[in-house]
Amino acid sequence: MKLSEISDNPGARKKRMRIGRGIGSGKGKTGGRGGKGQTARSGVRIKGFEGGQMPLHRRLPKRGFNNIFRLEFSEINLDRLQDAIDAKTIDASAVINAESLVAAGVLRRSRDGVRLLGRGELKSKLTIEVHGATKSAIEAVEKAGGSVKILAPKEDKGEAA
């Protein structure tokens, strides 16, 4: 077998149908679009139209709302923090805050602040500055001999300047 003799199996590649090329092609005249009217035109179609029946998106009740003042925190668990300390990406003697966590690659971005969660256990004595923490996380840090400082939340996103 030579490199120039390599080819696909017969029938592995199917030629596309060329539409609108005469009656003999089998896809001529209307080109598979049926009769005349809105659906025969390109780009025009009423989305969600059900032939006069009340559309599904109008039959269902409206629910909920989006709070524009909601703050989204990046969450980090204690076990993730301990893994970073073990891997020496974070210095346990320095103050751990959102900027240091992002710089170390533990978090991708800090969003509206960092929230500390209590999964896992901590072996190192840490000084942590976060925007929120659970009771169990604070207890675990203090049990290891460290301290947690809760920072004031960042300014609201919805306020006009």
From Swiss-Prot:
| MF terms in GO | rRNA binding; structural constituent of ribosome
Q: Name one Pfam family in it.
A: Ribosomal_L27A
In its keyword annotation, does this UniProt entry include RNA-binding? yes
Q: Name one GO cellular component term.
A: cytosolic large ribosomal subunit
Its GO biological process terms? translation
Q: Where are stretches of biased composition, namely Gly residues?
A: 21-37
Spell out the InterPro entries in the cross-references. Answer: Ribosomal_uL15, Ribosomal_uL15/eL18, Ribosomal_uL15/eL18_sf, Ribosomal_uL15_bac-type, Ribosomal_uL15_CS
Q: Where is this region: Disordered?
A: 1-43
Q: What keyword terms does UniProt attach to this protein? A: Ribonucleoprotein, Ribosomal protein, RNA-binding, rRNA-binding
Q: Which PANTHER family match?
A: 50S RIBOSOMAL PROTEIN L15, LARGE RIBOSOMAL SUBUNIT PROTEIN UL15M
Q: Which NCBIfam families match?
A: rplO_bact
Q: Its function?
A: Binds to the 23S rRNA.
Q: How does it assemble?
A: Part of the 50S ribosomal subunit.
> What family does this belong to?
Belongs to the universal ribosomal protein uL15 family.
Which named protein is this? Large ribosomal subunit protein uL15
Taxonomic source organism = Rhodopseudomonas palustris (strain BisB5)
* Organism placement in taxonomy: Bacteria, Pseudomonadati, Pseudomonadota, Alphaproteobacteria, Hyphomicrobiales
